[in-house]
Every structure is written in C-alpha cells, then in structure tokens.
A protein has these predicted regions:
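Bacterial N-terminal signal peptides that target proteins for export
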Residues: 1-11
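Bacterial N-terminal signal peptides
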Residues: 9-19
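Extracytoplasmic small-molecule ligand-binding "clamshell" domains
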Residues: 23-93, 99, 257
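Periplasmic-binding protein-like
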Residues: 32, 109-113, 202-249, 251-274
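A conserved helix-loop-strand patch within extracytoplasmic ligand-binding domains
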Residues: 63, 92, 103-155, 160
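Short beta-strand-to-loop elements that line the ligand-binding cleft
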Residues: 64-71, 157, 174-182
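A ligand-binding cleft/hinge motif common to bilobed small-molecule-binding domains
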Residues: 73-77, 90-100, 165-170, 184-187, ...
C-alpha cells in the first residue's frame, strides 16, 4: 500500500512538473528583416532591439522562449493559427489590428517618414511632426501640401503595413503605391531609382539611410497617431489573457529596471522607450 501511494505521488509530481515545463514555453514570432527592430547578422543569427528585449522579458516571466521567423504579411495569420504565441516584430498598436488580436502595453514609440534620394524634387519638404490623432487646421494644411507634392509620384512600401494603409487612405491623395514583401526590397528599389520615395518606420528608414552608404535622405513630416498607432507592443491572441498579463508585468519590470531604455539607446541611438 505504501509503495502504491509513493508511486501515485511520484506520477502526480511528474505530471505537475511536466505541465509547468509546457506552460512556460513561449514561441515568439518575428520577421528578422526589419533592422534595427529585428534582423539577422552575417552568420544568420537573429539580432536587434526586439530580439534582446524578448530574451529579457522571457527571463522576467520565467519562460523558455523560442523565436520563430515569419514573413511580415503572414505575421498576424500565423499568430491566429498558433504557429507561435506572441509577436515581437516592430508591430504598431493600431485600432484596426486590435479588432483581430490583443496588444501588450507599448514598449517603444515610433513614427513614420518618407525617404528619397538626395537631389529628388521631394527633398526639402516641410518636416513638421504631425499627429494624425488630431487633424487640426495645421495638420490638414500639411496633408494638403503632401497631396500636391506626391501627385503623380510612386511611393514604395512594405506590403500589409500601416504605411501602405496610410498611402491608400486618401489622406494624401492618390500617389502610385508599389508594395514589396520586405523593407529591404523597398530600400533597394528606392536606391535603384524605381521609387520616387519610400515610406517606412522612421527608425528603420533612418537605420538604412545611415548604414547604406547611399545618398538617402528623410523628407516631409514625421507621422504618428491615428493610422500609425500608439507605439509598438507585443501582439497576442484575443483568448490568451494570462499571457497578456505576464507580458505586461514583464514590460513593467524591464521599464523599471531601465532595460528598455538601455536597449533603445543601443539599437536606435536614443531613448525611444515607452
């Protein structure tokens, strides 16, 4: 009888330990193609702000995390199909996306900007920052000026992004919008002269402009708010409320300990933490 009880107890403890192991395994989807948020080095290893932040958050959550590479245009579908449990891929928190998935609190602020080649007719446009959450008279004037400047121009963007949505919204008229699978392809065609301008996350396009060795310059406003969202956060399935809570608590801890600021300064060159 004693042996039987010990056997049952051993099985019970083993089941508990096994359950905890599985409960603490988290798969995080990332693109690996959007520096400095997430990218790969020459040896193919994932690097970037979010790669290091993911590792820190997983330590705070006491979780064993695996990074799963996913093309950008399949990022949200992949989450919903349970290919991974969370998204950390420079994804802006927008009302449109929140109809489909949940987001953690933001961990980094972002904006968007146009980039052109030096000497372009679009170079030197008004660089006033505009927040599209509040379309006051000054913002409306800037949008009208942009509509005039972009008329007849080809603007290149990564597909399935807030940047594509903005250009196709009618807020800046109807420029020709050319889409690409990755931001790298946008950058290559911009330099090759197949785009009059590229629109992207300001941190990503600045990183390219500074490191490409090409005469790429930023022009026009820095866009934020409205269709550009409220910062970047972790994307999580609607029904994973416990995981959402764990990520939020881990982000709080990382912020309090200065880890997010440290990583932002390392990868962005300034403190873009939220």
């Amino acid at each position: 009888m004693i042996i039987f009880k010990k056997t049952i107890l051993t099985i019970f403890v083993s089941l508990l330990l096994t359950a905890n192991v599985f409960a603490d395994k988290i798969r995080i989807g990332t693109e690996g193609a959007y520096p400095p948020w997430n990218a790969k080095n020459e040896s193919g290893k994932l690097i970037g702000f979010e790669i290091e932040l993911a590792n820190i958050l997983c330590i705070y959550m006491g979780a064993e995390c695996t990074l799963v590479e996913q093309d950008w245009d399949g990022m949200i579908p992949g989450l919903r199909l349970k290919k991974y449990d969370a998204i950390m891929a420079g994804m802006s928190i927008t009302e449109e996306r929140m109809k489909t998935i949940n987001f953690s609190q933001g961990y980094a602020s972002d904006g968007a900007s146009l980039a052109v080649m030096k000497g372009s007719a679009l170079e030197g446009m008004d660089t006033s920052a505009i927040n599209l959450s509040n379309t006051d008279s000054a913002t409306k004037k800037i949008l009208i000026d942009l509509t005039t400047s972009l008329a007849g121009k080809t603007v290149c963007v990564q597909t399935a992004t807030i940047h594509q949505n903005f250009l196709e919204s009618g807020l800046v008229g109807k420029p020709t919008v050319r889409t690409y699978k990755t931001q790298d392809e946008v950058n290559l065609d911009l330099v090759a002269g197949r785009c009059d301008a590229g629109l992207a996350d300001i941190l990503a396009i600045t990183d390219f402009a500074e490191k490409s060795g090409k005469p790429v310059v930023l022009t026009g406003p820095v866009y934020s708010g409205g269709p550009f969202g409220a910062g970047v956060g972790v994307g999580i399935r609607k029904d994973d409320t416990d995981l959402l809570k764990r990520f939020n608590e881990a982000i709080d801890t990382a912020r309090e300990q200065g880890k997010i600021s440290e990583l932002a300064i390392k990868w962005f060159g300034f403190d873009a933490s939220m």
